[in-house]
Design a protein with these regions (language model features):
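Metal-dependent enolase-superfamily TIM-barrel catalytic cores that perform enediolate-based chemistry
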Residues: 1-69
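Catalytic cores of large soluble enzymes that bind and process phosphate-bearing ligands
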Residues: 2-5, 55, 106, 131, ...
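Shared catalytic-loop signature of beta/alpha-barrel
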Residues: 41, 47-50, 58-191
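Extended hydrophobic packing segments that form well-structured cores
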Residues: 190, 194-198
Length: 198
């Protein structure tokens, strides 16, 4: 029933948005390897861009086995911290899209090293960016200076921040309330600010 329900949901989404929208499916490390492969087979007709974190990313060998059996590309990496770990992940051909998070992988320097390792393996980055407008601006500068970017995550700046739990205040802050400038988003693209800094 689980696989059937998941497939039906994705079928409805694909029907609603059509073929001109890329579906990036976050599985949040919830499946065992065999189930991840089974789900991938069922979702192939809906042509998702990738399956993100179908299994826990702590076993790079197993992620490589899953990736080898799935025709849908795998994206992973938001919980990986060092460029050494990304190198091990990519040596096992465990993903097609690298989900490095600037906030945990060593900032700009670490992310540029990871991008270079990914490029050497013919892989693209899809930077992880769920938390704050400051991180959105940092990611925007990073992607503007990096060749092998597929797409990037862009949280809604007018919705409550996913990082509001970190303040301990209980106040729901919108991202646009935290900074003076929100990059312009138009037709699926963000404008890179001309002014210095993030």
């Amino acid at each position: 029933a689980l696989l059937y329900k998941a497939e039906r949901r994705i079928a409805k989404v694909r029907e609603a948005v059509g073929e001109d929208i890329d579906l990036c499916l976050e599985l949040h490390r919830r499946l065992e390897p065999g189930l991840a492969v089974q789900l991938s087979v069922r979702l192939e007709p809906y042509n998702p861009m990738f399956l993100e974190d179908p299994i826990r990313p702590d076993n790079f060998d197993e992620m490589g086995h899953v990736a080898a059996q799935c025709r849908i590309p795998i994206a992973t990496g938001e919980r990986i911290n060092t460029y050494h770990e990304f190198e091990m992940l990519l040596e096992r051909n465990a993903c097609s899209y690298v989900r490095a998070s600037l906030g945990v992988c060593g900032g700009f320097t670490g992310a540029k090293k990871i991008a270079a390792i990914a490029e050497a393996h013919h892989k693209s980055l899809v930077p992880h960016n769920p938390c704050s407008p400051v991180m959105t601006n940092a990611v925007l500068q990073f992607v503007a200076a990096t060749d092998n970017i597929a797409i990037t995550e862009y949280p809604n700046p007018f919705a409550a921040s996913t990082a509001d739990h970190l303040t301990g205040s209980g106040v729901k802050l919108r991202q646009c309330d935290m900074v003076d400038h929100i990059p312009e988003f138009k037709d699926g693209y963000l404008s890179v600010p001309e002014e210095p800094g993030i």
